[in-house]
């Protein structure tokens, strides 16, 4: 199988009535969610801390992490296993990004490398050059499969920096496409590029609330790993 040749963004697309209705409903529900957080009688930070921790658990469970919902509240007191560290690292990525967005108004390759390094810190993928864009051809498929047996082969490594720069131009612009369309296309493009040797899925899922916070000038408050 040959490496995929990714198109640059923005792309042309069409929406049917059903999708337009769903996007309108999503915007409405998101507005209600933000309003409820803002007008809540309790400190929403405690709620968001729990949501961020739950998101970290859900995202890493997709990758096979064996930590239960009950265990996640006691991670600080549990042995430092790879599963434990992966959840804590993902939570740290969100916290780091919240602070980054207070002083920066765009996502960059440097920022992406930094959060990828945090994500893979001291875990089983640590030998796969955390914080560095891949310089080899990777592919997706059953464990141990060859490139010929792959389900998908991402773009060649030489194209990764160019495609990321183009992606970030799109991600950082709130006016090219409607908000949730921008998020969906950005997520799809990031996973298509598969910029790192490992951790692309977790990083891609983390970028959704980060990009949403950037475009709405808010904190990361919407996490979608459970439904992706």
Task: Name each model feature, range by range.
Residues 1-228:
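FIC/Doc superfamily catalytic core
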């Amino acid at each position: 199988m040959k490496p995929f040749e990714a198109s640059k963004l923005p792309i042309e697309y069409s929406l049917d009535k059903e999708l337009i209705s769903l996007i309108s409903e999503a915007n409405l529900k998101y507005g209600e969610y933000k309003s409820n957080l803002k007008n809540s009688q309790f400190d929403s930070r405690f709620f968001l801390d729990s949501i961020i921790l739950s998101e970290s658990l859900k995202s890493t469970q997709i990758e096979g992490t064996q930590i239960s919902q009950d265990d996640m509240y006691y991670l600080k007191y549990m042995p430092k296993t790879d599963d434990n560290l992966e959840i804590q690292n993902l939570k740290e990525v969100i916290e780091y990004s919240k602070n980054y967005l207070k002083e920066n108004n765009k996502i960059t390759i440097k920022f992406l490398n930094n959060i990828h390094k945090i994500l893979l810190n001291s875990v089983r993928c640590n030998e796969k050059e955390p914080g560095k864009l891949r310089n080899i051809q990777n592919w997706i498929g059953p464990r141990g499969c060859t490139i010929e047996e792959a389900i998908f082969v991402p773009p060649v490594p030489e194209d990764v920096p160019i495609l990321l720069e183009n992606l970030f131009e799109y991600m950082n612009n709130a006016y090219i496409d409607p908000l949730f369309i921008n998020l969906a296309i950005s997520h799809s493009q990031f996973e298509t590029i598969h910029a790192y040797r490992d951790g692309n899925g977790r990083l891609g899922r983390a970028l959704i609330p980060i990009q949403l916070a950037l475009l709405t000038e808010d904190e990361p408050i919407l996490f979608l790993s459970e439904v992706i």
